[in-house]
Amino acid sequence: MKKRKIHHSDDEEDDTFYYRYSSVAAPPPSNPKHQPSSSAKSSAPGGGSGGLAPSKSTLYVSNLDFSLTNSDIHTLFSTFGKVARVTVLKDRHTRQSRGVAFVLYVSREDAAKAARSMDAKILNGRKLTVSIAADNGRASEFIKKRVYKDKSRCYECGDEGHLSYECPKNQLGPRERPPPPKKRGRRKEEEGEAEEISWSAAAPSLAVAEEEFEEENWASVVDNEAGERLRKREAEEEEERRMKRKEKKVSYFSDESDDED
């Protein structure tokens, strides 16, 4: 992986390092008999129809126009596929955009397509940098379904009388609201308690100042149905891996017992 410093115009304080996957594929192993494990196959770029790996379906977008809202970015990138969430980094004091966003797609293929199409494109006079975000292994802290109980004001501008979907600051106009989540009968979920998405694989590159995520209390676009699908697929993958490990362990002890007899 290559470490590079990202400079954003008009943002002198942003001196955080970001990490990305190299665009050059790793050389094949020298031993031809070595067969890659199923987990390695599923984590390879463009890894077929395997399960979702967040580090392969999350885009890192920088040099965005500071006036673009969360909803604007969602509208732009949803043209390439189903977007599960958009997170815009904001200054912790002024609450203004820092020109950086993470866009989580349901499909890694859609994420790759969006990265190819949007990278180096000029938007509002600024040249975008778009790439697949890298893994720093901190999914549980940042990839969360956020639920805001205060529905009296807009989480984009802070004003009352409208929601962020219809915020006047949205340059691309109002956005259709996602369908309300289905209640599952559990009291805590009905009360709106935030539920973590349990990723056992990689997370987006979040080696940025953590306060921006911890204090980001305004704009967060969450497609609830997409989140449900992601959680279900991840749970199925985890169960598959658990069963494979169990089978391998049983086979190993079976061989040992034969030798002893």
UniProtKB/Swiss-Prot annotation:
Residues 226-235 have a biased composition (Basic and acidic residues). One of its GO terms (molecular function) is zinc ion binding. A zinc finger (CCHC-type) spans 153-169. Disruption phenotype: Embryo lethal when homozygous, and defective for seed maturation when heterozygous. One of its GO terms (cellular component) is U12-type spliceosomal complex. Residues 18-51, 165-261 are annotated as: Disordered. CDD domains: RRM_ZCRB1 (cd12393). InterPro entries: Nucleotide-bd_a/b_plait_sf, RBD_domain_sf, RRM_dom, ZCRB1, ZCRB1_RRM, Znf_CCHC, Znf_CCHC_sf. The keyword Protein biosynthesis does not apply. SMART domains: RRM, ZnF_C2HC. The keyword Transmembrane helix does not apply. Keywords: Metal-binding, mRNA processing, mRNA splicing, Nucleus, Ribonucleoprotein, RNA-binding, Spliceosome, Zinc, Zinc-finger. Pfam families: RRM_1 (PF00076), zf-CCHC (PF00098). Residues 57-135 form the RRM domain. GO terms for biological process: developmental process; mRNA splicing, via spliceosome; regulation of cell division. Ubiquitous. Abundantly expressed in the shoot apical neristem. It is found in: Nucleus. PANTHER family: ZINC FINGER CCHC-TYPE AND RNA-BINDING MOTIF-CONTAINING PROTEIN 1 (PTHR46259:SF1). RNA chaperone required for proper U12 intron splicing and for normal growth and development of plants. Mainly responsible for meristem activity. Plays a role in regulating cell division. Component of the U11/U12 snRNPs that are part of the U12-type spliceosome. This is U11/U12 small nuclear ribonucleoprotein 31 kDa protein.
